[in-house]
Each structure stands twice: as structure tokens, then as C-alpha cells.
Amino acid sequence: MADIKNYTLNFGPQHPAAHGVLRLVLELDGEVIQRADPHIGLLHRATEKLAEQKTWIQSVPYMDRLDYVSMMVNEHAYVMAIERLLGLEVPVRAQYIRVMFDEITRLLNHLMWIGSHALDVGAMAVFLYAFREREDMFDMYEAVSGARMHAAYYRPGGVYRDLPDTMPQYRASKVHNERAIKAMNEARSGSLLDFIEDFTNRFPKYVDEYETLLTDNRIWKQRLVDIGVVSPERALQMGFTGPMLRGSGIEWDLRKKQPYEVYDKLDFDVPVGVGGDCYARYLVRVEEMRQSNRIIRQCVEWLRRNPGPVITDNHKVAPPSRVDMKSNMEELIHHFKLFTEGMHVPEGEAYAAVEHPKGEFGIYAISDGANKPYRLKIRAPGFPHLAALDEMAKGHMIADAVTIIGTQDIVFGEIDR
């Protein structure tokens, strides 16, 4: 009699639910997963090595391209590491701007997650709803940096420039008539802060819409409840952070436990899940969207009341203003040196971590006193989560592998680096 062998199946890297370039070798007993072996490296771009050949400031745009769904949060960890090496004080207004854009980025990430996760499982409508809101937030990115995704807006010592007083307007086109254009531009008639405030007033209603579609949906719960269960002890042992750790019932958030910038001055709650399954992680992330909206509102209120500088006045680190350059030879020299040679960072090492939408994103930077990093190590939050896929998927059906990949919120830019 022939032996009954397990069936080996390749999932990805071209699968639409693979979230990029994941190749998963699955060992199946019928439709039940016995082993899941993730093969990574298909998006490896040697970011850490490239950073060693660029000046400190030239590597800021590389950070955007790591987790390309959470652009500015990646930059934040990198510039914080440089600031620790330099011992730099960041102006308070710049800190509030950074925190506000960190939370806008968290919303961008979570909207992409909820849309793609639901689409993978079979709920198509949420994807279209989520991208409607993402469009407004890309406009916020564009208003401050000129780019809709890869902003390169944060700088060692602050941010590139202050918030603009005007918002880009929609123009007449063949697609929209004048009345539609006028309605679309209504929220854009004021400053960027006005536009963000208007968005924060609208956003809770949008989250309610997602919850109406999903939270009590019978099919959604059947696909997520008791799938990919991770106990609090195992979550800690496997190095989980962010919503993956909080979904297992452990209250750990760097914004509360190791506050950076002005998070200790802001009022928000840390949602914690019960059960450690895919549904618990879904509820945690949905509540995180509401809390991020609260933080953004507080930042808008503070920024309205408190004008001030948005970058350090140390011109060995930050470029002087264009006006000063035209009247002062020394400022012109600073500008020239900064953009040709770059700044020299004192010898030492620093680790800076931020509460990234996916977990703890850390930058470990070593300087030998030169104008380039001696070594740059990136701590990607998604890496330990993907390593746990085998344990989370074992014993589940093959269709549940898609749910588990979705709940991990994986992006390969940061995993492969």
C-alpha cells in the first residue's frame, strides 16, 4: 500500500494576498497546514549598506522606502537616532508637527491594513471606503512636502518647513462639473491645519462605517475568531510588539512606556485585546484609529496657539534660511558645506525606537566621527511577526493562512530592507 504523504504547496510570491513578495512553502495534510516556511529576501535592497555610503541627511529618503505604507514614522526613528548622537534639542513646535504626522501616518497604515485584510478575506467594500480617506491624508503629505508618499519631511533638528497656510485646490476637469469641484474644495479653502481639523471631525463617522460593515458581521467573525491565537507569554517570547502584542493582552506602547517627543503631554488611551486571535487584533487596530484621531486634534489645537521655529538654529546641522544666505557670507558657507560634505556626527552609538503602526521600529546608529554612519541597524517590527507565521498557522485550514498574513500587517520593504 502506498504511503500517504503531505502535500507541498507554494503560496506566492505572485499571490494577491501575499502583501508584496512573500513566498510561503506550505506543507499540507489535505487542507490543513502542517508547516509554513516563509522565504524572504525578494525585496532586499541593502538599505543598511547603502546608508554607510551616504551622508547622514542623504539617508532620510531611504527610510520612507522601508515600510512604504508608514513613511514618516520610519524617518522619525532615524532622525531621533541622529539627534541623540548630536545631543540636539528639537523645537517644541517641530515635536508637535512630528507627532501629528506620525498619527496621520498611523491612520494611513491602518486604513491600508483594514482595506487589504478585508479584501483578502472576501469583504471587498471596505477597501474602497478606506482608500477614500487615504486620499485626503495623501493631500496632507503633499501640502507639507510636495510628495504624496515618500515625503522626506523630517530633518535632524526638526522638520523641513512649517505648515503651509494654503491647501492645493482641485481644478475643473472633464470628470467633475463646477458644482462638484466647488464641493470638493470647500474644506480646502483655509490652511493645512483647517483641513486636518475638518478631517478629524469627519473621521470618527468613517470608522463607524467600517465597524458597521465588519465588527458584527457573522462571516467576518467566523473567519477571524479563534484563528492565529497567540498567548501573552508566547507573544513576548517571540518578540511581538505593537498591535500584535497588545492583541494578546499585554499593554505595551512606547508612546506611554518610553515617551518621546511630546507624547507625555497628550491624552490618549492604549487599546488592549482579549484572546490573542485575529479578531482581537482587528479590534485593537480599529480603536487605535480613534485614539490617533484624538491625538491629531490635540496637536492641531496646540499648533494653532503656538507659532515658533520648526528646526534648530544650529547651521552646522540645519541649513540657514534663503534670506540669510543672500546677505551673510558665513551662512552661504554653512549651506554649501552642509549639502556637499554633510554634517560630522560625534563618535558614539545610539538606539532610537518609535511606536510604529506595526510595532517597535528601531534605528541603531554607530558614528565614528565622520560625515557618514559607520553602521546602521534597522529593527523591523514585521520580522519577528513573520517568523511566528509557522506557529500561528499550524493546524488551520489553507484559507486561514491568508487571514493570518493579513492580521500580521506585513510589508516587505521593512522585512527585507
Curated annotation (Swiss-Prot):
It comes from the Bacteria. It is found in: Cell inner membrane. It is a peripheral membrane protein. InterPro entries: NADH_Q_OxRdtase_suD, NADH_UbQ_OxRdtase_49kDa_CS, NDH1_su_D/H, NiFe-Hase_large. GO terms for cellular component: plasma membrane. PROSITE patterns: COMPLEX1_49K. Pfam families: Complex1_49kDa (PF00346). It is an enzyme of class 7 (translocase). Keywords: Cell inner membrane, Cell membrane, Membrane, NAD, Quinone, Translocase, Transport, Ubiquinone. Its EC number is 7.1.1.-. Its main location: membrane. GO terms for molecular function: NAD binding; NADH:ubiquinone reductase (non-electrogenic) activity; quinone binding. NDH-1 is composed of 14 different subunits. Subunits NuoB, C, D, E, F, and G constitute the peripheral sector of the complex. NDH-1 shuttles electrons from NADH, via FMN and iron-sulfur (Fe-S) centers, to quinones in the respiratory chain. The immediate electron acceptor for the enzyme in this species is believed to be ubiquinone. Couples the redox reaction to proton translocation (for every two electrons transferred, four hydrogen ions are translocated across the cytoplasmic membrane), and thus conserves the redox energy in a proton gradient. This is NADH-quinone oxidoreductase subunit D. It comes from Cupriavidus necator (strain ATCC 17699 / DSM 428 / KCTC 22496 / NCIMB 10442 / H16 / Stanier 337). The lineage of its organism: Bacteria, Pseudomonadati, Pseudomonadota, Betaproteobacteria, Burkholderiales. The gene is nuoD.
